[in-house]
Amino acid sequence: MHCPFCGANDTKVIDSRLVAEGEQVRRRRECLACGERFTTFETAELVMPRLIKTDGSRQPFDEEKLRAGMQRALEKRPVSVERLEAALVHIKHKLRATGEREVKSLVVGELVMTELQKLDEVAYIRFASVYRRFQDLNEFREEIDRLAREPAKQ
């Protein structure tokens, strides 16, 4: 690895540790030319499947769009950023685990609803109302009644 201070090619690893729940390797390095120390982080580059929209068009997976949609549903709800990020990691893991190059956007929507239901039922109802295009109060009631009948998902 090139030294960010002097540009030399020769660096040695002093220390390596797993971070981010084993998803990253943190390495402390030292330049053999100038002696400066610096930290690098390694993550596996995993390709997310492309999404097939309901109209048949295809687009790349957009983590920021997913995060924004979940944040909108969780707005003013008592859910930490850490729990949201963990839910995002879980959704991405499930999508990669399909082994498919393309997945229907409906699959992503269902995964989001499952994770939101675990995080906060109000956020789940908010998201479901938009995602499933609730037309009237009866549809809200039916979904709330269904939630009330289910055992808590944690």
UniProtKB/Swiss-Prot annotation:
Its cofactor is Zn(2+). Binds 1 zinc ion. Pfam families: ATP-cone, Zn_ribbon_NrdR. A zinc finger (unnamed) spans 3-34. One of its GO terms (molecular function) is zinc ion binding. The keyword Metal-binding applies. Residues 49-139 form the ATP-cone domain. GO terms for biological process: negative regulation of DNA-templated transcription. Keywords: ATP-binding, DNA-binding, Metal-binding, Nucleotide-binding, Repressor, Transcription, Transcription regulation, Zinc, Zinc-finger. InterPro entries: ATP-cone_dom, NrdR-like_N, RNR_NrdR-like. PANTHER family: TRANSCRIPTIONAL REPRESSOR NRDR (PTHR30455:SF2). Negatively regulates transcription of bacterial ribonucleotide reductase nrd genes and operons by binding to NrdR-boxes. Belongs to the NrdR family. This is Transcriptional repressor NrdR.
